Amino acid sequence: MKRKLFWICAVAMGMSAFPSFMTQATPATQPLINAEPAVAAQTEQNPQVGQVMLGVQGADAPVVAQNGPSRDVKLTFAQIAPPPGSMVLRGINPNGSIEFGMRSDEVVTKAMLNLEYTPSPSLLPVQSQLKVYLNDELMGVLPVTKEQLGKKTLAQMPINPLFITDFNRVRLEFVGHYQDVCENPASTTLWLDVGRSSGLDLTYQTLNVKNDLSHFPVPFFDPRDNRTNTLPMVFAGAPDVGLQQASAIVASWFGSRSGWRGQNFPVLYNQLPDRNAIVFATNDKRPDFLRDHPAVKAPVIEMINHPQNPYVKLLVVFGRDDKDLLQAAKGIAQGNILFRGESVVVNEVKPLLPRKPYDAPNWVRTDRPVTFGELKTYEEQLQSSGLEPAAINVSLNLPPDLYLMRSTGIDMDINYRYTMPPVKDSSRMDISLNNQFLQSFNLSSKQEANRLLLRIPVLQGLLDGKTDVSIPALKLGATNQLRFDFEYMNPKPGGSVDNCITFQPVQNHVVIGDDSTIDFSKYYHFIPMPDLRAFANAGFPFSRMADLSQTITVMPKAPNEAQMETLLNTVGFIGAQTGFPAINLTVTDDGSTIQGKDADIMIIGGIPDKLKDDKQIDLLVQATESWVKTPMRQTPFPGIVPDESDRAAETRSTLTSSGAMAAVIGFQSPYNDQRSVIALLADSPRGYEMLNDAVNDSGKRATMFGSVAVIRESGINSLRVGDVYYVGHLPWFERVWYALANHPILLAVLAAISVILLAWVLWRLLRIISRRRLNPDNE
């Protein structure tokens, strides 16, 4: 017995020697809660010197230096939580989450979660609590105290940085109770509201990474970084046409990778950047900080350290001349999968197949039916689980000129599976498009309908359904969101204290099959122009060819930094819309060369002299003087298209001012009636700053429509003024219907005349047949 007591005491003393690795949170008896985990304290005492950069293996992997540069970031729920940023956690939907990433060349050394929440006044103290998880690891628990009920509460919880990876999810789980027995999880008294001002305070430390192109495009673009990709472009001086084209290809490729994050390409002439950047240099023209670099004998792409900061990397695009730089740029855009080492030589980039119209990777294909599997952006996008499953969303990016006016609908064949309701009730699947309800389908509880279950590897208990849906075509735009909501009538426990019914709620599972299809292949391409909304939303008409092979950009001779920045930001924005680089873009600084070209024209800086007198132009910006034509009647709503008489120019006003202004204008090309001109103009450096800000800001682009968008300090004002022209092709009968669509009275008159003529022809035909039948000898 003494031996047993000895061993028990020894084990107890040994266990007490271990530090506690469990996050502890003190009850929130004060307005501010500070939950300090033992691990966090230990981390501060022992800095993480020597931690290997995540995702990199081997003896040469970079480590965290104690004196390395760091940055402090505050991510609010308004920025990173699902809209609107606040969360209401309920008994049947107890979970809410936020997501954030970590760049490959950084590690998080400190993290603090700041919560602002209000618990329901009906909750039971202490039994109700808020659990915090990071990547499914419990970070701590915040009990709800009596003093907090119905009041705004502030809480701080340290997050262990050892659990932070390249992609992270912070999950809040609400455990709520409002009575000791016989609770209903659907009770409206079970809630906890998390405010949108809650957030994460993170300290990132930069890693001293190797110069290795095998990780390209990291660190110049990191898909784990949710911020706008700001990537300076450095030139020795004002670039000529060949170098402008090469830099535009690189910018459009980075834009295609940035996607929804946005992109910004500041331009520097013979200056050192203060962050990761792209540098263009030839043997004869190079920035001063590269003057000692050996001359190259071929197109070379090299990753080097910043001369003054080893934590900043420069991607240098070298060449003997502009032709080499153009080949190197195409190598970045199309051959980067082969990059490795500190430098690569681009021997050849040879096109094998030409691009086709409307084949942009980010657009839904219009030449055949498309499966939902092709539209997924991540693996589990088309499935959901929960007592009330979250909605399933699918994005549809369409060409802006898809003609859907007389369409009866878009064919969509949906294959879906779902957990079978236990009884026949009102459980259903609702389908919405752009927040507009389309159709609803009942979720059947009949087991005999489960015939397709054996043909596909799914869990037992799921019911298969196949449904055809017609989408109202007029509700579609260039960017669309298709939403599937599965609504279950879940049985809930309840009763009284003496007669209580309890059971364990079972999660429901719903799946939209990858083989579901949507078909846009039966429709023509036809659009009235000018339409700056098509340009602002999808880069149209330039994006019709994803490689911009039918686009000519007219630049000023010896462009300044702001004008080059406008070029790079514009092609970067178009690349983000198409998902493909502008490898075949043509750039010129001679406005006379565009005459007679079968191409869409992008003008940056100023209207060429040969076009200044064109009657189609509705606005002109030149230094301090500008003029604009205004229409007879103007509507502020982009969805309302005025008729021809309202668009007619009524006045032309000319003004002189020292204030900054920029503009985007669209008009028909004088050289081809199926081509368009988009001009991006500014009158000063501040004007170009506002223009670039508008190009990079999706919210400001959304306010552009019509033929003229004027950009001032106060915002953007758009006008529809001047003549309308049409781009695309319609059969003659569709053109007739389109012409009559805005004239219902004329359409009714023509319909009546057509009926009368048809009746007269039939009457004459019947008379002839009757005469021949009664007098066969007269044949």
Residue ranges and their predicted role:
Residues 5-7, 27:
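Sequence-pattern detector for short linear motifs
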Residues 15-24:
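C-terminal segment of classical bacterial N-terminal signal peptides
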Residues 1-4, 743:
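Positively charged n-region of N-terminal signal peptides that target proteins for export
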Residues 26-779:
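Solvent-exposed alpha-helical segments and adjacent loops
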Residues 7-13:
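Sec-dependent N-terminal signal peptides
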